[in-house]
């Protein structure tokens, strides 16, 4: 019986630890993490690993629903290797964006949220870097669409104000004006939620 009471007390304290923000409250969450970015219809390329960092604001509309929006600096694009005159050349397409995720956060269990929404974004950097041995060069990338739209889908886990999240951003619009490639980005972040 003592074991049963101890287990019940532990479960109750765990639920309290994982509780969301009070209904009607606002919070801000600075966050930082890793992007694994690629482009659709670019079969001979590899992902570009890059930084994602920024902050998201959330309104806790109910016990099960929060609505959030944010601003994130996001390093995207892809990498690859080509052969020029018998030498391997490593090529990196650097597409950097300011992403503005607008998400519904549905809490399916204490501390766990499923996230879905839309993400407008603005391209702020478009460069191609080529490197062979000790030689490197950089030039402007293909003619980009400065506005991008994607659909983020993710899962997050909250514990004592820390938020661990995995998200996939599915590109809805073309990244370039004259090509059909779209952004495809896996994103892993750690944040800290601060009540406002």
Q: Model segments located where?
A:
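Flexible, solvent-exposed loop segments that connect beta-strands
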Residues: 38-45, 75-96, 124-147, 174-181, ...
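Residues on the lipid-exposed face of transmembrane beta-strands in outer-membrane beta-barrel proteins
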Residues: 30-34, 51-59, 71-73, 100-106, ...
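Short glycine/proline- and aromatic-enriched beta-strand/turn motifs that initiate or cap beta-hairpins
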Residues: 20-60, 64, 68, 171
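A short beta-strand-loop micro-motif that forms or neighbors metal/cofactor-
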Residues: 44-45, 108-128
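Bacterial Sec-dependent N-terminal signal peptides
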Residues: 1-27, 31, 190, 194-196
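Outer-membrane beta-barrel channels and translocator barrels
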Residues: 21-23, 60-62, 109, 159-162, ...
